[in-house]
Regions:
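Short amphipathic alpha-helical segments and helix-helix/interface helices
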Residues: 13-16, 44, 64-69
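A short alpha/beta connector and helix-capping loop motif
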Residues: 35-51
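Flexible, charged surface loops at secondary-structure boundaries
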Residues: 17-21, 48, 70-75
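An N-terminal domain-cap segment
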Residues: 21-22, 26-27, 32-40, 56, ...
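N-terminal accessory regions of nucleic-acid-interacting proteins
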Residues: 1-25, 29
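Active-site-proximal helix-loop-helix substrate-binding element of RNase H-like nuclease domains
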Residues: 3-5, 46, 53-66, 73-163
């Protein structure tokens, strides 16, 4: 998948200001949760605006905490699947909560659907994804750079259909 790397504060802030406040974006995170190193760390932010994919690497020296916080606290609606653990990570790392979130998982649960994102996409969008590969990549080392093409494909696939599920 092609994507735009928002690899500087200037690009992140420009991206935020370019978004239409009435159009939601799909967002997800990859983090490290005591699997490869002690502690919890934000490793990647992936975004889909319905047309293009974007990646923010918060581990990059060119990306400041201020720019990442500006993204999460912006008024743009962020469509997520199961934001609870990601919001907890953001609070632990930055001391903030994510603003203006629509949680697809909360909606699915309210409608009686208890499955994960893959099963939700299969059920409602008739997609067929290989959950074995997804499971393997969930536990990859997201702190290690450079990220592989496989890791990036995995990360972007988590936001690809969220806007449709909303």
């Amino acid at each position: 998948m092609k994507y735009v790397s928002l690899d500087s504060d200037e690009k992140i802030l420009s991206f935020i200001s370019s978004l239409n406040q009435s159009s939601p974006i799909a967002v997800d995170l990859e983090g490290e949760f005591n699997l490869h190193i002690y502690g919890e760390h934000l490793c990647l932010i992936q975004i889909f605006d319905g047309k293009d994919f974007y990646i923010i690497d918060p581990r990059s020296k060119a990306v400041s905490e201020k720019a990442v916080v500006a993204f999460f606290t912006s008024d743009i609606q962020k469509v997520w699947f199961d934001v609870q653990s990601d919001n907890s990570l953001i609070f632990k790392v930055y001391g903030i909560t994510i603003n203006n979130v629509f949680d697809v998982r909360a909606l699915a649960k309210a409608l009686g659907f208890m499955g994960n994102l893959i099963s939700l996409e299969e059920e409602f969008l008739k997609l067929n994804k290989d959950s074995v590969d997804k499971k393997k990549l969930q536990q990859t080392n997201w702190l290690k750079r450079p990220l592989t093409d496989e890791q990036i494909e995995y990360a972007l696939s988590d936001v690809e259909y969220l806007l449709e599920l909303k």
